[in-house]
Amino acid sequence: MNPALRTFFCLIVAALTPMRAAYAPVPETDEGRDLVVRVRTAIAHDSNLFGAASGAIDSSVYTVAPGVNWNRSLTERTFLSASYALTLDRFDRRPGDKLLDSHDASLRLAHAFSQSTVLDLNNAFMVARNPESLLAGVKVNADQSFLRNQFDGRFTVPLAPKVTGTAKVRSALYEYRDSDLSRALDRIENLLGLAADYAVLPEVKAVAEYRHQDIHYSKLGELKNKRSDYVMAGADYELARKLTVSGRAGLEWRSRQGERSAIAPYAEFSGKYAYAQRAFVLGGVGYSLEETSDTARFNDSQALRAFITLQHPLTALIVVSGSVSLEPSTLQGRRGQADVSETTVRTGVTLSYLPTPKWLLAASVDLDRADSDDAVRNLRRTRFSVNATRSF
C-alpha cells in the first residue's frame, strides 16, 4: 500500500500490540495494566504457503508465540510503552526451513508540553518469516520473508485560538530475505507532512495538508526511485469518541526516475462507530499510486482500496469479528509494457471466546484472492486456525 495512504489513513486499524492475528480483529484483554505477558498457541492450515499462482504448497502450521507489553506514565505528561513478541512456526510440508522465527518489537514515547502541544514518537521493528499477506506475481514458491523497520513522528502545536498545526514524519526500511526479491524490492520510504486544521465546530475540523514522499530502492534505483508531492483538503469529525469520520481529497504529483512522471488523484476516507462495549464497525476507502511487487515491468499501481471491519459481542463471553478488503487496481506498465488490471480481495472471520479475563480462545478463517489479466499474478490462499492465548 502507498506509504502516504498507510501513514495517515490506516493508522486507525493498526494494533498497538505486536502479537500477530488473523485479518479479523481480536478483542483486547487486560487493559489498564502496566505489564502484560501473553503466550499464544495455534494450530493452522495454509493452502498456499508462498502465494504461488500454480503449484501451490500447502501445510499444517503449529505456532507458539510469547510476547510482552509494557506501558508506563513516566510523569503526568510523559508516556512510554514497549513491546516484543516472538513467533515460532513449525511446518510439516514446507521446503527448506521447517521452523521459522518471527520477531516484532515496538517502542513509543509521547510527551505533552501543554494540553495542546504534543510530541509522539513510535518505532516498530519486524522480522516476518511467515508473512500474513503475500505478494502476487513473484517467482514460483519464493520465500517472501522480510525485515521492516518503521519510525513515525508527530508534533502537534496550536497556531491560533481555533487553528492547530501538525508536522508528521515517517521512515520505513524494507529488506527481503530472498535474493531476487531483495534486488527488486529492498528500499527505504521517507514521508514528510504538514497540516493545519481549523475548528469549525467543537466536533468538526477543516483540514489542509501537504505531504512529500521519497522512495529510494537499494538496487537499480536509477530506474525505480520516485518522488511525490501531495496537496489535499478535507475534514475530521468526532462525536463523543463513539463516532469518528475523516476524509482527504487532492492531487499527487509523482516524478519517476527513468520513466514518465504522472499526476493522479488522491483520496482517503475512513470512519469508525463504537456502538457498544467491544462492538464497533470500521470502514474506509482510499485511492492512490502504490508500489508494485513487479518493479521490472511496472512503475507502480493505481489502486482503489476499500475495507470494512466489524466486531460484535454475541454474548458476554463470545465475540464475532470480520473484515473484508477490496482492491481493484491497474498496474502502470513501463515503456513498452502494457498496463495490467487486477483485483485483490482479502476476507477474514474470527470467533472469540473469553472465559476469563486472562484467557482467549479463537477460531478463524482467512481467504486471499487475486484475479489479474496476467495469469502469473493470480493468487488463491485459504487459512484456517484455532488458537488459545493466556495472559499473565
Question: Which residues does each PLM region occupy?
Answer:
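Cleavable N-terminal export/targeting peptides
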Residues: M1-T29
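Gram-negative and organellar
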Residues: A22-F392
